Amino acid sequence: MWDLEYCKDLDLQHNLDVMHIEKNICDSIVGTLLNIEGKRKDILKSRIDLTHLGIRKDLQVQDEGKPRDMAPAVYVLDKVKRKEFCKVLSRVRFPHGFASNPERRVSADGNKVQGLKTHDCHVLLQRVLPIILRGLGRPKLYRAVAELGQFFKELYSRNIRIDALERLRDKIPTILCDLEKIYPPAFFDVMVHLAVHLPDEALLRGPVQYGWMYPIERRLGTFKGYVRNRARPEGSIAEAYIAT
């Protein structure tokens, strides 16, 4: 990309997808909170990292430690709290067309949340997750996640002022610092740090509705529904598109 002649003249050199950044951050928070295999960030290696870095002594584990030696953390719920979290989530009801039914995302054993789509994470992070965390008695975590959800909520505004974007640009580093006081370093992958650049991109591009992937994903979903011969998906899509 950097070899292209016009690249140096572009003001907006990257068009970061707000939709997937928000989803990945939400997946990391929920996966760690409910201790979901494959999505959690609180694993044995992350605790050993704390020992090597000499920080967060209350959560440190020695090199020869085992997962059962990991001390309880505020960002991970125990089994009783996980069931309570899923129970509350399954009882949430939204106006028709606002969001999908959260009950469908709760596993049969009522112990974890699975199959979250991008819009599910959008609603969960901005509106539902802070309320549940406050009810579960996690005030420090609640404040940090609520600030993060409010950041995305303001960023998603249809009409947004330049001074509001400048305020969000100054606010997001503080929000991430608050999260760093709670979560281990392993939580902060590239997707979490990309949130810092979103207000700057909105200042250059305009409202995020002109740069997110929702319409593209919906259109791709329509095309996938055209597939009848999975051995030749492109031909199936082309024939169905011409027929319509």
Language-model regions, residue ranges each:
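A structural signal for the principal folded core domain
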Residues: 1-244
